[in-house]
């Protein structure tokens, strides 16, 4: 609705929750362009990936096109099997992504905690991602200000700016 309301084209999304309630993966596909007919894209077709956890970036890397950008939260969530010791968390997730894609790795969870609310981690990642969208004419900060509740507006603006700065430092 936000994209359409600003005359920026069509946008469609699809979410797959799978075993999310049991610590499993969640994926969302978003397609945005002048004319979009549906939300689904295939392997190697995504221009940008935003991963809220670094192992998830590797898990879904096959959807990113070779010139795509991976924006990754440098954070590990230990699944039940890893927490129990049955498996080990894989090392080198971000490095593996850097070998194949332009990668922006930021400690979004840590930044959100430093700002006082871990729930704003997604806004930190949004800030880290926005310059990769190739839309300099869009005032993303204004969009954040207009779309979040007034009581958390300043927090979200700080999170957005911190994400943008972290992305610049990551390059």
Predicted region positions:
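Single conserved hydrophobic/aromatic residue that forms the stacking wall/gate
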Residues: 1-12
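Structural motif
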Residues: 9-10, 29, 47-49, 68-71, ...
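N-terminal beta-loop-helix "entrance" segment that forms/cooperates
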Residues: 13-41
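Short, ordered loop/turn segments at secondary-structure junctions
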Residues: 16-18, 54, 75-76, 108-109
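Solvent-exposed alpha-helices and their adjacent loops that cap or buttress functional pockets
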Residues: 19-24, 40-43, 62-64, 95-98, ...
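Glycine-rich phosphate-binding loop
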Residues: 36-76
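Rossmann-fold NAD(P)-binding glycine/threonine-rich loop
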Residues: 79-101
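Aromatic-enriched
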Residues: 96-123, 128-171
């Amino acid at each position: 609705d936000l994209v359409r309301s600003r005359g920026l084209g069509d946008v469609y999304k699809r979410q797959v929750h799978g075993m999310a309630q049991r610590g499993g993966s969640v994926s969302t596909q978003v397609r945005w362009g002048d004319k979009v007919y549906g939300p689904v894209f295939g392997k190697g077709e995504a221009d940008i990936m935003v991963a809220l956890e670094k192992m998830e970036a590797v898990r879904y890397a096959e959807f990113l096109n070779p010139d795509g950008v991976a924006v990754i939260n440098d954070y590990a969530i230990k699944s039940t099997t890893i927490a129990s010791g049955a498996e080990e968390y894989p090392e080198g997730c971000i490095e593996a992504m850097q070998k194949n894609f332009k990668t922006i790795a930021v400690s979004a969870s840590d930044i959100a905690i430093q700002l006082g609310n871990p729930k704003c981690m997604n806004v930190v990642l949004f800030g880290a991602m926005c310059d990769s969208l190739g839309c300099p004419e869009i005032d993303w900060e204004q969009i954040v200000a207009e779309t979040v509740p007034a009581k958390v507006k300043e927090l979200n603006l700080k999170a957005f700016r911190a994400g943008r700065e972290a992305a610049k430092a990551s390059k």
